[in-house]
Amino acid sequence: MARLVGVDLPRDKRMEIALTYIYGIGRTRSKEILAATGISPEQRSKDLTDDQVTQLREYIEATLKVEGDLRREVQADIRRKIEIGCYQGLRHRRGLPVRGQRTKTNARTRKGPKRTIAGKKKAR
């Protein structure tokens, strides 16, 4: 099993897909990496030679910010926005959608489950 930047790549997937298991690498970037290293996107990760694994590892470490480094950078950016008190920071602090989505309805993922509020009592 090939191991790159702390992630075990799935053995039976094509390299184009297997690389997307690394945080920070999607389909497009995966294709770019394979083109730059000269590895076929159709090749399975179990069929990689040690030289190819080394080549991939060196390319990714030299040119991309992935996994732990990228996660830390994203968290630092969020913390910085919260500290400076910008609008996006306030939205993060309140646990609401940050990018202008509606909140009257929807936004349940960000806001969490509904909190039921007692309605008006019926008059008799």
Curated annotation (Swiss-Prot):
For the region Disordered, what residue ranges are annotated?
95-124
Q: Which GO terms describe its cellular component?
A: cytosol; small ribosomal subunit
Please tell me whether the keyword RNA-binding is annotated for this protein. Answer: yes
Q: Report a single Gene Ontology molecular function.
A: structural constituent of ribosome
Q: Does the keyword RNA-binding apply?
A: yes
Similarity comment:
Belongs to the universal ribosomal protein uS13 family.
Its quaternary organisation is: Part of the 30S ribosomal subunit. Forms a loose heterodimer with protein S19. Forms two bridges to the 50S subunit in the 70S ribosome.
Name of protein = Small ribosomal subunit protein uS13
Q: Which organism is it from?
A: Mycobacteroides abscessus (strain ATCC 19977 / DSM 44196 / CCUG 20993 / CIP 104536 / JCM 13569 / NCTC 13031 / TMC 1543 / L948)
Taxonomic lineage of the native organism:
Bacteria, Bacillati, Actinomycetota, Actinomycetes, Mycobacteriales
The gene is: rpsM
